[in-house]
Structures are given as structure tokens and as C-alpha cells.
């Protein structure tokens, strides 16, 4: 992929029985506006890997503590939510929800209504009331909205934002002090850019527009940053 210029670089990490047996950086982490060599401590936007490493992991931690059950209805935690959707439907993409909602359309509606709700609150309220293309359990449809919903379930239980919870509950105890949403400015020189348009690069901000604009960077569908 690097040779064919599909990606500028990568980091390969092999873990066996809990120990790193191989760790190597290849190529470059940036080529615009200047070339930067890839390093093993480069931090990446995890894109949709944020779903299992973020929202799902948080939900499973709560399940292990007896605070959440996959058969619970989402409406127990988000009262206005579709009444027939269970936690397991969110986790397995069988909620019937649309695949996505564009940030541009959501934000235009948000601004037009002049609501006092925050953008994240408006987003989950819109998801909770939206028209679904299929019935719950009827059809598998990969949906970012499932995991924004799961995030909000988690936050309703823990009483804090998922970023703070996961940093303290999982990432830092595992020794990964750089993992989480909204990476610190002090880490910017280690973060690989995700996209560059006219030599202006997205670095340290989640690439997904719905997560970046409507969820302000902390979202169940995207936004986790970490090393390999």
C-alpha cells in the first residue's frame, strides 16, 4: 500500500500473549506540507475503530459491573428514544436506524431552529426521533448513529463524559496515557494528519464531520486517538 502510494506510511505492532513481539514504523506519517518520517509513537485517528475501543468497551465495562445489560431498552436511559430498541441492537447494527446523518444538514437544522440545546444534545434527540428505514431486528445496517446512541447510554449511567471515564477506567490503567478523544495540544507533533486539502491538514481533530461538528469531538462513532 505504501509502495503504491495508497497510504504514506504505517506502524505494524504484533502482540503475542500480552507482550509486543514486533513493532516497526514504515514510510511517512505526513507528506504535506512537509515530509515527516513515521515513528512507532505516532498517534492516529482511529476512525471507526473508535466504536469497539470506545463506546463498546465502555458499555461492556458497565455490563461487567452489573450497571448495564445488553437486553436493556435504550429508552430506559434516553426516554425519548425509539421504544423497541435494545442495547444489543445498537451493538450489532440491528436497530433499524439510518446509516448516517450528515453534519451539514444537521447543523443547518440546528441553527435554523435556534434551540438552546447543545449540538450533541440536539444530535441524540434527532437520532432518538428519526424515521427508521427498517424495523428493529429486521436488517443489518452499519450505522454510526448506533454508537452515538450507545455513548449517550453510557454517559447517562456514569454521569460524566465518556472520554474522562475511559481514560480513567481503561486507557490509563493499561498504560496508554495518550489514548482517548480530544488529544492534548502537546501531542500534536506526534499525530498523523488524516486529510489535507490545499495543504491545510486535519491534525488532532476527528476526521468524521458528524463527530467533529455535531458531537464536538467526543463521539461514540469516531474520534479516539491512539498509537498502534
Residues of each region from the PLM?
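Short, conserved catalytic-motif segment at the N-terminal edge
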Residues: 1-44, 67-71, 125-129, 202, ...
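Short, surface-exposed loop or secondary-structure junction motifs
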Residues: 85-228
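Short, solvent-exposed turn/loop segments enriched in Gly/Ser/Thr/Pro and often Arg
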Residues: 16, 74, 78, 182-188
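Hydrophobic pocket-lining residues that define ligand/cofactor binding sites across diverse proteins
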Residues: 2, 62, 154-157
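Amphipathic, positively biased hydrophobic alpha-helical segments used for protein targeting
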Residues: 29, 38, 65-68, 107, ...
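Short active-site loop at a secondary-structure junction
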Residues: 4-11, 33-90, 134-145, 219-222
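Residue-level detector of alpha-helical secondary structure
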Residues: 16-17, 58-61, 169
